[in-house]
């Protein structure tokens, strides 16, 4: 089941979505995980996910979830059904585009006081029964195969880009 089905507030489920395991010791049923949790710069208890912060953000970057088909702001919700249902601030950018410029427009706009640009990375020590590691892998880069015409022709898409175009929650709301 997805996290939405299980419920993120389940007392036996710990998520470290912005975390990176640095050390895992122990045996099945009894692990100690040392992890570094990157800051979101958003207080998850205060964020109402209203989106007013995103509306005033002056920075636009390619939306990685939509495979660059559309833009997103430096303060954004990773995807519509994100858990936790809260925003995150991208301070780093993507290598080609800069992230947050600390203009503080979002802080002024946020009625719930959820934004904290001074949040620091946090060391976590978790005692868990099981560890799920979701490393992911980068998708194929079709640019290395020029015979496909990717980026040369507007209507040439990868399979995952086409999946996002067809999705009701994608950049075209499923309309082709």
Where are these regions (language model features)?
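Central beta-strand plus flanking loop segment that forms part of the substrate or channel wall
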Residues: 154-167
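Non-heme iron-sulfur electron-transfer modules
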Residues: 1-4, 16-46, 58-108, 112-133, ...
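Short, intrinsically disordered, charge-balanced linker/junction segments flanking boundaries
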Residues: 173-176
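Short, conserved active-site loop motifs that form the nucleotide-linked donor/cofactor pocket
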Residues: 11-14
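N-terminal structural subdomain of ketosynthase/condensing enzymes
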Residues: 169-171
């Amino acid at each position: 089941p997805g996290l939405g089905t299980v419920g993120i507030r389940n007392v036996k489920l710990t998520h470290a979505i912005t975390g990176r395991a640095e050390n895992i010791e122990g045996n099945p049923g009894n692990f100690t995980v040392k992890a570094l949790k990157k800051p979101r710069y958003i207080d998850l208890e205060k964020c109402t996910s209203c989106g007013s912060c995103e509306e005033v953000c002056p920075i636009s970057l390619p939306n990685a979830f939509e495979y660059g088909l559309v833009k997103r702001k430096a303060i954004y919700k990773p995807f519509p059904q994100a858990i936790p249902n809260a925003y995150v601030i991208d301070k780093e950018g993507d290598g080609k585009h800069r992230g947050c410029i600390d203009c503080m427009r979002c802080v002024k706009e946020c009625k719930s006081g959820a934004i904290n640009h001074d949040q620091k990375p946090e060391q976590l020590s978790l005692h868990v029964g099981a560890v799920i590691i979701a490393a992911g892998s980068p998708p194929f880069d079709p640019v290395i195969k020029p015979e496909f015409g990717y980026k040369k022709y507007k209507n040439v898409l990868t399979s995952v880009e086409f999946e996002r175009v067809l999705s009701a929650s994608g950049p075209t709301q499923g309309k082709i």
